[in-house]
Amino acid sequence: MTTRSQDQTRDLKVLGTGRLTSPEGGPSVALLEAFPNCFPQRPYVISISFPEFTSLCPVTGQPDCGTITVEYIPDELCVESKSFKLYMFAFRNHQSFMETITNNVLEDLRALLNPCWCRVKGLFAPRGGTRIHVFAEAFKDGMPEEQSALVRETVRSWKSEPDPHRP
């Protein structure tokens, strides 16, 4: 017998469609979907890593490759992982600097989720002998003081892990 949790899925459009092709029109927050967080009272970290990220240099058109890692403490919403994957695919033919990409991913996730905290790490492969790593993060404005302290302590603890992304 199959059992079911209280997860809300009725508004998800991408998951289960079999759609795997790169979206038209480039990256956009409209490609992302979210579902309700069943545990908004508890600060916990969600980490999503996309190790096959590719985009194009806006000057040369040469490919840039790397890993994009998103870490966040959800408030009311969580990002749906397949929509996140398709969002990442949308960068494949998009020309932009690595610094802009990392900050745009942060802003798009903040617009969609309004998380308590979010950090995006762009760990780009060396090109021309230079390795670029970009880190962008933001805390939610206006959290009650007690919640803010708990969130910041959770972030501090998460960041002190030796390698929180290793299985």
From Swiss-Prot:
GO terms for cellular component: cytoplasm. The keyword Cytoplasm applies. It catalyses: 7-aminomethyl-7-carbaguanine + 2 NADP(+) = 7-cyano-7-deazaguanine + 2 NADPH + 3 H(+). Keywords: Cytoplasm, NADP, Oxidoreductase, Queuosine biosynthesis. Its EC number is 1.7.1.13. It is an enzyme of class 1 (oxidoreductase). The active site is at C57 (thioimide intermediate), D64 (proton donor). It is found in: Cytoplasm. GO terms for biological process: queuosine biosynthetic process; tRNA modification. Substrate binds at V79, E80, S81, M98, E99. Coiled coil: none annotated. SUPFAM superfamilies: Tetrahydrobiopterin biosynthesis enzymes-like. Residues 1-24 are annotated as: Disordered. The keyword 4Fe-4S does not apply. GO terms for molecular function: preQ1 synthase activity. Pathway: tRNA modification; tRNA-queuosine biosynthesis. Catalyzes the NADPH-dependent reduction of 7-cyano-7-deazaguanine (preQ0) to 7-aminomethyl-7-deazaguanine (preQ1). Belongs to the GTP cyclohydrolase I family. QueF type 1 subfamily. This is NADPH-dependent 7-cyano-7-deazaguanine reductase. It comes from Desulfovibrio desulfuricans (strain ATCC 27774 / DSM 6949 / MB). The lineage of its organism: Bacteria, Pseudomonadati, Thermodesulfobacteriota, Desulfovibrionia, Desulfovibrionales. The gene is queF.
